[in-house]
Amino acid sequence: KKCGVGIVNHYYVARMLAGVNGRRDALYAKKIKVLTPNPAHVNISAGGVAKYATNKNEAIQLLEFLASPEGSKGLAAPTFEHPLKEVNQNEIVKNFGEFTPDSVTVEDLGEKNSLAIKLMKDAGWN
């Protein structure tokens, strides 16, 4: 069957273009045009330190490293995600073009969480 439009996170297309799962994926991905809405939703990645962690200082150092340009690039490169703004992107991701993140905050997501779960349940998702 043919499909005119699909919605997918950009990093799946980037993985295909890079041939992570083989040459065939790369050939299919070359037929796809990535369009980014403006503004675009951004998946949230977060880290934290457990209240009773015995190694809090080391955990904080790890989080600080992951939030640094070097750590961000190390996280983003193999997964084809967008790194921090001041870090060079993977070329495939860079070729998708610039985007403006939407203004949704973590607080917004928390406020709408119960409604989202209700909608999913009402639609038959388990």
Whereabouts are the PLM-identified features?
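Substrate/cofactor-recognition hotspot
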Residues: 62
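Stable alpha-helical elements in mature extracytoplasmic
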Residues: 12, 55-59, 71, 92, ...
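Ligand-binding pocket segment of bilobal, Venus flytrap-like solute-binding proteins
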Residues: 1-33
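An extracytoplasmic/periplasmic, membrane-proximal ligand-sensing/linker region
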Residues: 84-126
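Solvent-exposed loop/turn segments at secondary-structure junctions
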Residues: 11-15, 39-40, 53-54, 68-69
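A bilobed periplasmic-binding-protein/Venus flytrap-type ligand-binding module shared by bacterial periplasmic
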Residues: 43-56, 74-75
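Periplasmic-binding protein-like
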Residues: 65-89
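Extracellular/periplasmic catalytic domains that process cell-envelope and extracellular macromolecules
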Residues: 25-28, 40-42, 54-57
